[in-house]
Amino acid sequence: MKTVLLPLKIKDTESISWTKGLITYLKRSYGSSQWSVFYDGDKTAEIDSCRTTANSDLAPESLLDQNYKYAAILEQIYLRLGAHSGSLQMDFTWYEAEYHSRLSEKKFKQHTVVFEKSSVMYNIGVLLSQIAKKKMSDNYKSAIPYLSKAMACFDYMSNNFLNSPSIDCAAENTSFLSTLLHAEAQEMFLMTLINGPDASKRASLISKLAHTALNLYEKCQEFYEDSSTATFGTTPYGEDKWKDIITLKVHLYRAISTYNHLRVLEEAKKIGEAIAYGKLAVHEIKEAGFYKVYVKDEIDLTGLKAVIEEKLKSLIKDNDFIYNDLIPADVSIESIKTMDAVKPVTWEEQLKVYLEQVVDLCNGAFKGIVPMEVYENESIYSEEKASLLRKEVEETDTADWEYQSFIEFTDLPKLIKDLESRYVHGGNGSSDDPQYEIMKQKITTWSKVVQDSNFKDVRAQMQNILDKRNEILTILSSVSPDQRENALKIKNSLVQASQSDDKIFASINPCLEEVNLLANHQLLWSIMSKFQIRNDEPSLLDLDDSKNQQILDRLHNIKHNQEILRLLKEERTRNLKDFKESLNNDDITQKLILLTGKPKKEMRVIFEEELTKFKPLSTRIEATIFKQNNLINDIKIKLDEVFKLIGVQDKTPEQENTVKERQTFFDKVEKAFNQFVIFSTDLPKGLNFYDTLLKMTRELSHASTPGQSVNLIDSNTLPPNLPQKSTQSTTLTKSFANLNLCNDVNDSVTQSPANLANTNNTGVNPGPPQLPPKPLSTGISGLVSDQKLQNGPTSFYNNPSVFDENLYSKFSK
């Protein structure tokens, strides 16, 4: 498959003389007698030569190198003059790129270096695009770096040159070009995959990449549709054919994305959805055909259309005769994920090497233009301001954290509200036990969860699993010898499942008493009620109502202080914001220019004096922190007084013991509930696993009857073999009953067929001799197997490859 890149055109310019401009500037700055001290004729001539070469007729690669070098020189002069580059009084004249004949003589003239820099950057982006177009003919992949650099170049222009008089350098147009080159770079990456080997195996990746390319070209399409600069019958920017080519690519890559998504759905056996996306792909490729007039020789839409229609026809036929899958009436490409494969190289990174190359040249040519010392001092001063800001931000964040922690720890708003509602009408709470009420609410919730659970009877679940194991072993004992290998593999899975069960029940067994208690509402509350602290003596508050008023007065004071704390936090936030704005708006460049040549020691003193202007704001922030600490301490003292008045701290030794016992009981119940939640979550996985294993066992038994056959289970689909120790005399049924087959994979034992077949302890049927021990799992597979059993009790059940997924279909053959 082939594609095309939109052709970008170079801007032309008129010649200028940096020699003349610098001489004029230096004479005006230093006088007719001193200007030559700051002038270097050779290096200035080299700059003129560089600009001339950058706008010559050399090959794109050579022009690109010269334009990068000239852009670095412009960056150096801009660092020295900044917004005052117009003081050079040089006329920079640039023509518009000739995308239309009416633009051939259109030109703009400005004095600023910024205008010169933006025009040079435009040409760099165009040259990168032209080189990419040449590289594309040999290898699509080799064009991607050039397009990604061009994309970053135009993106930088759209964000930094906002008021350019040139149409080419206008922010909206450079933003469009950045998006266009981004789309083309994504397109090159996509073409590399489509034309590469095994494209069918990368259908999912291709659909995502094509979706991203589609989105980018849609943005370009919106530029033509929504641009306010467009006039009737013309396009807002570029050649007239660009709009049709972009529209074609929108439909083309929507078709490619949906077609490859069709192939993904086909692999997943979602035939109905695949057909729906196939119809969408056919529609889009037909729509693309209406815009092929400019690319009919480069892009083969007819061949792609035939491929899509043939695939759709095949899927419809298969669905009619085999799958009978429901075809959705409507599907959207938005359900296909996107993937951006382009990593742009920023403009700063592109220019970094060239900036280093022209340092000596610019230091000689521009030594009379605001020395770099000014920028060095400004950088040092900026770091001083940054250090001051970091200090204030750190102190503010710490104070905010202390405030938030105090409010959350004490739950102050709710505490004040509850205490006020208790005492506002002259009531008292001396006989209340708030801690007991909180515990009661939590235990009530836990008890309801346990009572509503289908797994609250843990021992019954243990017996249920044991019954399923025995049934499986009973069936396996009767399979024919030719199915012995399949039976052993199922038994191996059964042994590993028992190890997971052992871990599940081992976590819940120590808490059975508390779990049973949560399941028994009447017994639970008969025990819990013993821990309630009751005060049968007359309340002192009933005898002295003045304490109620004392409590309310202190609560009012606490509430007032809480509001002040909130206001202090808001004020601190405002002060910090003002502090940041003050730092950002501070500019001492002019002062530094006047202080050029001062020793570093003197500059340090000057910096410290300048920083004192921020002291008032810093002091206001520190004041809010100081007041906050005092208020928090005052609130703590008032809370202690309130608790003493309501008798919270006046407990008898017997009551203290009751509180400790209650807390111990609560902790046990809480631990039991948490273990039960884990148990009730993990156990269903095990039950589902046993049901599946039982179904397989029954089908294996059916396959053992005459006239039936079954293929061997692929050993690669089973987990690693378990290591084996010496044979134990106890039967597997007894081990299952005790739920203690093994505690770790490395200590597990593979039972002999005879022992596995026995479902009671009579030992009447000795069975055939034991199989030899299997080797330990080694290497990566063994390690992964061990880790899975250690990480979670039910990790074994989550393994989809415990047994062959196609075994059921084999049994039915």
Curated annotation (Swiss-Prot):
GO CC term, one of those recorded: endosome
Biased segments, Pro residues type: 766-775
Compartment(s) where it occurs, according to its Swiss-Prot or TrEMBL record: Cytoplasm; Endosome
Alphabetical list of SMART domains matching this protein: BRO1
Domain of life: Eukaryota
Record Gene3D superfamilies: alix/aip1 in complex with the ypdl late domain, alix/aip1 like domains
Domain annotation BRO1: ranges: 4-403
GO BP term (any one): protein transport to vacuole involved in ubiquitin-dependent protein catabolic process via the multivesicular body sorting pathway
Annotated InterPro entries: ALIX_V_dom, BRO1_dom, BRO1_sf
Chain residue ranges for the region called Disordered: 704-729, 752-781
Keyword terms of this UniProt record: Coiled coil, Cytoplasm, Endosome, Protein transport, Transport
Protein family per UniProt: Belongs to the BRO1 family.
Role: Involved in concentration and sorting of cargo proteins of the multivesicular body (MVB) for incorporation into intralumenal vesicles.
The protein's name in its UniProt record: Vacuolar protein-sorting protein BRO1
